[in-house]
Regions:
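Structural register within alpha-helical repeat arrays
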Residues: 75-76
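Bacterial Sec signal peptide processing site at the extreme N-terminus
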Residues: 13-36
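Flexible helix-coil transition and linker loops at the boundaries of alpha-helical arrays
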Residues: 20-26, 58-66
Length: 123
């Protein structure tokens, strides 16, 4: 009887100790990104308001020494391109390529598309 209680107590202690083990920090900091993407698709905020919110979130992410999630800079670049701030859009696309090399083909496509639309607009 005492042995059963002792084993139960040891099992409970091991279970609780396993739950209390330090967890690994998340790979990316999603600070405000997902709500902004949702707002973008719902059309509830202007592009400039979204840019301001994402820039603020990016500063917070960097202040904590974390990395923004995949697509963060791409979304920011598309917002900049949408309001005509081409240089900032280019910088955001380049930042996305640098952080996530697997996005290079898509970022190149967006930059090429942006360049082509600028040439068409000038004609």
């Amino acid at each position: 009887m005492k042995r059963g209680i002792g084993l139960s107590a040891i099992a409970a202690a091991l279970l609780l100790a396993g739950c209390a083990a330090p967890t690994t920090p998340p790979l990316y900091q999603w600070n405000g990104y997902q709500p902004q993407v949702y707002e973008y698709f719902k059309g509830k905020t202007s592009p400039q308001e979204q840019i301001d919110a994402l820039e603020k979130a990016l500063q917070e992410i960097r202040a904590k020494g974390n990395t923004p999630p995949p697509g963060f800079h791409a979304h920011l670049g598309m917002l900049y391109a949408g309001i005509g701030q081409e240089q900032q859009a280019e910088q955001a696309f380049q930042a996305e390529k640098q952080l996530f090399p697997e996005s290079t083909a898509y970022m190149d496509f967006l930059m090429k598309k942006k360049t082509a639309s600028q040439k068409t607009a000038k004609q």
